[in-house]
Amino acid sequence: MVTEILILLAGLALVVLGADWLVDGSSTIARKAGLSEFVIGLTIVGIGTSTPELVVSLTGALKGNADIAVGNIVGSNIFNTLFILGFTALIRPISMTRDNVKTDIPLNIITTVLLIIFGMHFTLFGIGNDNTLSRLDGVIFLILFAAYMYWSFKSGKAEETKDSADHESGKLWVAILMVLGGLAALIFGGDKFVDSATNIARMLNISDKFIAVTILAGGTSMPELVTCVVAAAKKKGQLALGNILGSNIGNILMILGVSAVAYKPQPGSPSGLSFSGMTFVDLGILLLGALLIWVSAFTRKGRKLDRVEGSILLASFAGYMTWLLINL
């Protein structure tokens, strides 16, 4: 048990370190291309900080563990929205732009609804009963993700100012090396992280789903947490908001899309990524978090996630964790 815990911590450390290198390198490249702060957060940083989730979920899918692959994403998005945004808002309220309210936040809600519909295969409406995300579903998700990335870059190109050029003086070759080194650390660390977490769960007779939506989800979301806290401290709320929205959308469309396509079922298991381990509470909390961000734009202070609303997000997360422990 002690050995597995040490491997788990070492794997997590590599994942977080790798993500840090990847984000720094990607941000340097993005700023040299003249992208706006929000678009950097939404795309490069958002997707970069989701790389741990990609490694963990893809590894789970390749090993035929659907609970790890699916639970990690559902848990990660819940952690991102309720805990990270809630905690970040406590540090400094997050202002929202008109585009955030009209386009970006609704896209997060739509993506979440798509996950529920595709994952449950319309069983909520009495049609179909396999509760899996098939390879075809995964391909559809990846096509939607490609369209989303194209739209984000096309609509978010910003003129590079002298100030931003002076601020980002890092060398391009160093940034590329950081990206490659970060990916290597993420892949190796993620593999060890999944193996040790699964072994610990089985030693303690704890379900893979519980481990996935708590330890794995929280652990792989550490890059998002660190990024958002630093962004809030530096008064870069748009970077923090873009990071979470981009991460959540990327988790669903890119990571679950790739995982569904690559999934190798174990003998006797469904042919697609099974959502049988997910309950209405899990998916309901996931959707609630997406809706709460949108609702906060229309409350008393308007287009701002303030400390009161951040506290509501944190209270919702605490309630969900309590429910998980009660139903362990």
Regions picked out by a protein language model, each given a short descriptive name:
Residues 1-328:
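Hydrophobic alpha-helical segments, chiefly the membrane-spanning helices
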